[in-house]
Amino acid sequence: MTINPDDLCRRIMADPEACATEDEALRLLELPAEQTLPLIACAQRIRTAHAGPAFTCAIVNARSGRCPENCSFCAQSAHYATGAPEHPMLNTAALVEHALKLADAGADRFGIVTSGTRPAPRELETVCEAVVRIRARTHLSPCASLGQLSPQAAAMLRQAGLERYHHNLETARSFFASVCTTHDYDEDIYTVKLAREAGLAVCCGGILGLGESRAQRAELSGQIKRCRADSVPVNLLTPVAGTPLERMDPLPPFEALRTIAVFRFMHPQADILVAGGREHVLGEYRSWTFISGANGLMVGNYLTTAGRSTADDYTMLRHMGVLR
Protein backbone atom coordinates (compact mmCIF):
# COMPACT_ATOMS: atom_id res chain seq x y z
CA MET A 1 0.00 0.00 0.00
CA THR A 2 1.39 3.40 -0.97
CA ILE A 3 1.61 6.26 1.49
CA ASN A 4 1.48 10.01 1.01
CA PRO A 5 4.05 11.69 3.29
CA ASP A 6 2.27 15.03 2.98
CA ASP A 7 -1.01 13.58 4.28
CA LEU A 8 0.79 11.96 7.22
CA CYS A 9 2.71 15.18 7.86
CA ARG A 10 -0.52 17.19 8.04
CA ARG A 11 -1.97 14.70 10.51
CA ILE A 12 1.08 14.99 12.77
CA MET A 13 1.20 18.77 12.42
CA ALA A 14 -2.41 18.99 13.58
CA ASP A 15 -1.95 16.73 16.60
CA PRO A 16 1.26 16.90 18.69
CA GLU A 17 0.54 13.42 20.06
CA ALA A 18 0.24 11.84 16.61
CA CYS A 19 3.15 9.99 15.02
CA ALA A 20 3.90 7.47 12.31
CA THR A 21 3.48 3.80 13.17
CA GLU A 22 6.18 1.23 12.41
CA ASP A 23 4.20 0.11 9.37
CA GLU A 24 3.87 3.68 8.13
CA ALA A 25 7.57 4.27 8.79
CA LEU A 26 8.51 1.28 6.65
CA ARG A 27 6.28 2.48 3.83
CA LEU A 28 7.92 5.90 4.03
CA LEU A 29 11.36 4.29 3.90
CA GLU A 30 10.34 2.33 0.81
CA LEU A 31 9.01 5.29 -1.16
CA PRO A 32 10.68 5.66 -4.58
CA ALA A 33 13.80 7.79 -4.78
CA GLU A 34 11.96 10.71 -6.38
CA GLN A 35 9.92 11.04 -3.17
CA THR A 36 13.00 11.57 -0.97
CA LEU A 37 13.04 15.38 -1.16
CA PRO A 38 9.29 15.76 -0.46
CA LEU A 39 9.71 13.34 2.47
CA ILE A 40 12.61 15.39 3.86
CA ALA A 41 10.61 18.60 3.44
CA CYS A 42 7.77 17.10 5.50
CA ALA A 43 10.19 16.08 8.26
CA GLN A 44 11.52 19.63 8.34
CA ARG A 45 7.96 20.95 8.83
CA ILE A 46 7.34 18.52 11.68
CA ARG A 47 10.62 19.49 13.35
CA THR A 48 9.80 23.18 13.11
CA ALA A 49 6.32 22.65 14.54
CA HIS A 50 6.96 20.17 17.32
CA ALA A 51 10.64 19.69 18.21
CA GLY A 52 12.67 21.74 20.65
CA PRO A 53 15.28 24.33 19.70
CA ALA A 54 18.49 23.37 17.96
CA PHE A 55 21.33 22.26 20.21
CA THR A 56 24.83 20.83 20.13
CA CYS A 57 26.34 18.06 22.20
CA ALA A 58 29.98 17.18 22.85
CA ILE A 59 31.49 14.17 24.61
CA VAL A 60 34.63 13.04 26.37
CA ASN A 61 35.99 9.50 26.14
CA ALA A 62 36.43 9.10 29.89
CA ARG A 63 37.61 5.48 29.78
CA SER A 64 38.73 3.97 26.51
CA GLY A 65 39.12 0.45 25.18
CA ARG A 66 39.26 -3.08 26.62
CA CYS A 67 35.49 -3.50 26.56
CA PRO A 68 34.39 -7.11 27.19
CA GLU A 69 31.39 -6.76 24.85
CA ASN A 70 31.75 -7.98 21.26
CA CYS A 71 29.72 -5.35 19.39
CA SER A 72 30.77 -5.92 15.79
CA PHE A 73 31.06 -2.22 14.92
CA CYS A 74 33.08 -1.08 17.92
CA ALA A 75 36.75 -0.07 17.91
CA GLN A 76 36.87 -0.39 21.71
CA SER A 77 35.93 -4.07 21.94
CA ALA A 78 38.65 -6.26 23.46
CA HIS A 79 37.57 -8.99 21.02
CA TYR A 80 39.14 -7.19 18.05
CA ALA A 81 42.61 -5.82 17.26
CA THR A 82 41.78 -2.30 16.13
CA GLY A 83 44.62 -0.27 17.60
CA ALA A 84 42.11 2.07 19.23
CA PRO A 85 43.36 4.17 22.16
CA GLU A 86 43.21 2.59 25.60
CA HIS A 87 43.30 4.46 28.88
CA PRO A 88 41.84 4.05 32.37
CA MET A 89 39.18 6.30 33.85
CA LEU A 90 40.04 10.00 33.76
CA ASN A 91 39.99 11.72 37.13
CA THR A 92 37.47 14.35 38.14
CA ALA A 93 39.76 17.28 37.36
CA ALA A 94 40.39 16.02 33.82
CA LEU A 95 36.67 15.57 33.17
CA VAL A 96 35.95 19.09 34.38
CA GLU A 97 38.77 20.48 32.23
CA HIS A 98 37.27 18.84 29.14
CA ALA A 99 33.87 20.27 30.04
CA LEU A 100 35.25 23.79 30.43
CA LYS A 101 36.92 23.67 27.01
CA LEU A 102 33.77 22.40 25.32
CA ALA A 103 31.63 24.97 27.10
CA ASP A 104 33.94 27.69 25.79
CA ALA A 105 33.59 26.20 22.30
CA GLY A 106 29.81 26.67 22.52
CA ALA A 107 28.43 23.20 23.29
CA ASP A 108 25.04 22.97 25.00
CA ARG A 109 25.33 19.43 26.37
CA PHE A 110 28.32 17.48 27.63
CA GLY A 111 28.42 13.68 27.80
CA ILE A 112 30.82 11.60 29.90
CA VAL A 113 31.27 8.28 28.09
CA THR A 114 33.04 5.13 29.30
CA SER A 115 33.79 1.82 27.63
CA GLY A 116 32.75 -1.40 29.31
CA THR A 117 29.59 -3.18 30.37
CA ARG A 118 28.92 -1.10 33.49
CA PRO A 119 30.78 1.40 35.71
CA ALA A 120 32.82 0.27 38.71
CA PRO A 121 31.82 1.91 42.03
CA ARG A 122 34.82 4.25 42.10
CA GLU A 123 34.24 5.26 38.48
CA LEU A 124 30.64 6.08 39.29
CA GLU A 125 31.80 8.27 42.17
CA THR A 126 34.22 10.07 39.84
CA VAL A 127 31.42 10.80 37.37
CA CYS A 128 29.14 12.06 40.14
CA GLU A 129 31.88 14.35 41.48
CA ALA A 130 32.52 15.68 37.98
CA VAL A 131 28.82 16.34 37.37
CA VAL A 132 28.57 18.43 40.55
CA ARG A 133 31.57 20.56 39.51
CA ILE A 134 30.48 20.88 35.88
CA ARG A 135 27.06 22.15 36.93
CA ALA A 136 28.70 24.66 39.26
CA ARG A 137 31.18 26.02 36.72
CA THR A 138 29.48 25.84 33.31
CA HIS A 139 26.16 26.28 31.52
CA LEU A 140 26.40 22.72 30.17
CA SER A 141 23.64 20.16 30.55
CA PRO A 142 25.53 17.09 31.89
CA CYS A 143 24.89 13.66 30.41
CA ALA A 144 26.52 10.27 30.93
CA SER A 145 26.87 7.04 28.97
CA LEU A 146 28.36 4.43 31.29
CA GLY A 147 26.78 1.18 30.15
CA GLN A 148 24.29 -0.85 32.14
CA LEU A 149 22.96 0.63 35.38
CA SER A 150 21.63 -0.64 38.68
CA PRO A 151 18.79 1.22 40.42
CA GLN A 152 21.32 2.47 42.98
CA ALA A 153 23.69 3.79 40.30
CA ALA A 154 20.86 5.59 38.51
CA ALA A 155 19.76 7.21 41.77
CA MET A 156 23.34 8.34 42.54
CA LEU A 157 23.67 9.99 39.15
CA ARG A 158 20.36 11.79 39.50
CA GLN A 159 21.23 12.99 43.00
CA ALA A 160 24.55 14.38 41.71
CA GLY A 161 22.66 16.51 39.22
CA LEU A 162 22.97 14.47 36.04
CA GLU A 163 20.20 15.51 33.67
CA ARG A 164 20.27 12.84 30.99
CA TYR A 165 21.40 9.23 30.63
CA HIS A 166 22.45 7.89 27.26
CA HIS A 167 22.13 4.21 26.43
CA ASN A 168 21.72 3.08 22.84
CA LEU A 169 19.84 -0.01 21.70
CA GLU A 170 22.16 0.06 18.62
CA THR A 171 19.79 -1.83 16.28
CA ALA A 172 16.50 -3.69 16.09
CA ARG A 173 15.86 -6.65 18.37
CA SER A 174 15.51 -8.90 15.31
CA PHE A 175 19.04 -7.95 14.15
CA PHE A 176 20.79 -7.60 17.50
CA ALA A 177 22.29 -11.12 17.57
CA SER A 178 24.10 -10.26 14.33
CA VAL A 179 25.73 -7.31 16.10
CA CYS A 180 26.37 -8.46 19.69
CA THR A 181 26.18 -11.78 21.55
CA THR A 182 27.74 -10.90 24.92
CA HIS A 183 24.61 -9.40 26.43
CA ASP A 184 20.89 -9.54 25.85
CA TYR A 185 18.76 -6.86 24.20
CA ASP A 186 16.44 -6.74 27.20
CA GLU A 187 19.35 -5.70 29.43
CA ASP A 188 19.65 -2.50 27.40
CA ILE A 189 15.93 -1.83 27.58
CA TYR A 190 16.06 -2.39 31.34
CA THR A 191 18.84 0.19 31.76
CA VAL A 192 16.80 2.76 29.83
CA LYS A 193 13.82 1.98 32.06
CA LEU A 194 15.90 2.38 35.25
CA ALA A 195 17.25 5.73 34.10
CA ARG A 196 13.76 7.04 33.43
CA GLU A 197 12.45 5.73 36.75
CA ALA A 198 15.28 7.55 38.53
CA GLY A 199 14.06 10.83 37.06
CA LEU A 200 16.68 11.15 34.34
CA ALA A 201 15.86 12.19 30.80
CA VAL A 202 16.62 9.35 28.40
CA CYS A 203 18.86 9.54 25.33
CA CYS A 204 18.39 6.33 23.35
CA GLY A 205 19.17 5.63 19.71
CA GLY A 206 21.26 3.43 17.50
CA ILE A 207 23.57 3.00 14.51
CA LEU A 208 22.46 2.85 10.90
CA GLY A 209 24.35 0.91 8.26
CA LEU A 210 25.22 -2.26 10.19
CA GLY A 211 23.62 -4.43 7.51
CA GLU A 212 20.10 -4.11 8.85
CA SER A 213 17.06 -3.89 6.58
CA ARG A 214 14.75 -0.91 6.23
CA ALA A 215 12.14 -2.87 8.15
CA GLN A 216 14.63 -3.27 11.00
CA ARG A 217 15.29 0.49 11.01
CA ALA A 218 11.56 1.05 11.46
CA GLU A 219 11.57 -1.65 14.16
CA LEU A 220 14.41 0.07 16.02
CA SER A 221 12.61 3.39 15.89
CA GLY A 222 9.46 1.75 17.23
CA GLN A 223 11.33 0.22 20.17
CA ILE A 224 12.92 3.60 20.95
CA LYS A 225 9.41 5.07 20.92
CA ARG A 226 8.25 2.45 23.43
CA CYS A 227 11.24 3.38 25.62
CA ARG A 228 9.87 6.97 25.62
CA ALA A 229 13.20 8.46 24.63
CA ASP A 230 13.53 12.20 25.13
CA SER A 231 16.48 12.34 22.75
CA VAL A 232 17.26 10.00 19.85
CA PRO A 233 20.90 9.94 18.69
CA VAL A 234 21.38 8.65 15.16
CA ASN A 235 24.86 7.32 14.38
CA LEU A 236 26.03 6.30 10.91
CA LEU A 237 28.51 3.44 10.70
CA THR A 238 32.12 4.33 10.07
CA PRO A 239 33.78 0.93 9.48
CA VAL A 240 36.79 0.31 11.72
CA ALA A 241 39.68 -1.86 10.54
CA GLY A 242 39.92 -5.02 12.63
CA THR A 243 36.20 -5.25 13.40
CA PRO A 244 33.82 -7.70 11.66
CA LEU A 245 32.21 -4.75 9.84
CA GLU A 246 35.46 -3.29 8.50
CA ARG A 247 34.40 -3.89 4.87
CA MET A 248 30.78 -2.76 5.22
CA ASP A 249 29.78 -0.36 2.48
CA PRO A 250 28.56 3.02 3.77
CA LEU A 251 24.91 3.94 3.53
CA PRO A 252 24.18 6.17 0.54
CA PRO A 253 23.81 9.74 1.83
CA PHE A 254 20.16 10.10 0.88
CA GLU A 255 19.30 6.72 2.41
CA ALA A 256 20.70 8.06 5.69
CA LEU A 257 18.85 11.39 5.35
CA ARG A 258 15.61 9.61 4.45
CA THR A 259 15.93 7.49 7.59
CA ILE A 260 16.56 10.55 9.77
CA ALA A 261 13.42 12.07 8.24
CA VAL A 262 11.36 8.98 9.02
CA PHE A 263 12.63 8.99 12.60
CA ARG A 264 11.20 12.52 12.86
CA PHE A 265 7.82 11.22 11.66
CA MET A 266 7.92 8.65 14.48
CA HIS A 267 9.32 11.02 17.13
CA PRO A 268 7.76 14.43 16.43
CA GLN A 269 8.55 15.97 19.82
CA ALA A 270 11.82 14.22 20.71
CA ASP A 271 15.26 15.65 20.13
CA ILE A 272 16.92 13.90 17.20
CA LEU A 273 20.70 14.21 17.29
CA VAL A 274 22.99 13.24 14.42
CA ALA A 275 26.24 11.98 15.87
CA GLY A 276 29.07 9.72 14.73
CA GLY A 277 29.68 8.97 11.07
CA ARG A 278 28.05 11.99 9.48
CA GLU A 279 31.30 13.11 7.84
CA HIS A 280 31.97 9.63 6.44
CA VAL A 281 28.44 8.93 5.20
CA LEU A 282 26.95 12.32 4.36
CA GLY A 283 30.01 14.09 2.99
CA GLU A 284 28.91 17.25 1.18
CA TYR A 285 25.35 16.67 2.43
CA ARG A 286 26.25 16.86 6.12
CA SER A 287 24.45 20.20 6.46
CA TRP A 288 21.22 18.50 5.38
CA THR A 289 20.66 16.84 8.75
CA PHE A 290 18.60 19.74 10.09
CA ILE A 291 16.67 20.02 6.82
CA SER A 292 15.89 16.31 7.21
CA GLY A 293 14.32 16.63 10.66
CA ALA A 294 17.18 16.55 13.16
CA ASN A 295 17.48 19.35 15.71
CA GLY A 296 20.76 18.35 17.35
CA LEU A 297 24.33 17.81 16.28
CA MET A 298 27.30 16.22 18.00
CA VAL A 299 30.32 18.49 17.68
CA GLY A 300 34.00 17.89 18.33
CA ASN A 301 35.62 14.47 18.41
CA TYR A 302 33.85 11.15 18.83
CA LEU A 303 35.00 8.26 21.01
CA THR A 304 37.85 6.94 18.86
CA THR A 305 37.60 9.00 15.68
CA ALA A 306 38.21 12.67 14.98
CA GLY A 307 35.20 14.80 14.23
CA ARG A 308 34.93 17.88 12.08
CA SER A 309 36.33 21.16 13.36
CA THR A 310 34.01 22.55 16.02
CA ALA A 311 34.44 26.05 14.59
CA ASP A 312 33.45 24.79 11.13
CA ASP A 313 30.33 23.13 12.52
CA TYR A 314 29.22 26.29 14.32
CA THR A 315 29.87 28.37 11.20
CA MET A 316 27.73 25.94 9.19
CA LEU A 317 24.90 26.09 11.74
CA ARG A 318 24.95 29.88 11.85
CA HIS A 319 24.89 30.13 8.06
CA MET A 320 21.85 27.84 8.04
CA GLY A 321 20.12 30.06 10.58
CA VAL A 322 19.88 27.15 13.03
CA LEU A 323 22.05 28.84 15.67
CA ARG A 324 22.66 32.52 16.27
Swiss-Prot record:
One of its GO terms (biological process) is biotin biosynthetic process. Its cofactor is [4Fe-4S] cluster; [2Fe-2S] cluster. Keywords: 2Fe-2S, 4Fe-4S, Biotin biosynthesis, Iron, Iron-sulfur, Metal-binding, S-adenosyl-L-methionine, Transferase. Pfam families: BATS, Radical_SAM. It catalyses: (4R,5S)-dethiobiotin + (sulfur carrier)-SH + 2 reduced [2Fe-2S]-[ferredoxin] + 2 S-adenosyl-L-methionine = (sulfur carrier)-H + biotin + 2 5'-deoxyadenosine + 2 L-methionine + 2 oxidized [2Fe-2S]-[ferredoxin]. Pathway: Cofactor biosynthesis; biotin biosynthesis; biotin from 7,8-diaminononanoate: step 2/2. This is Biotin synthase.
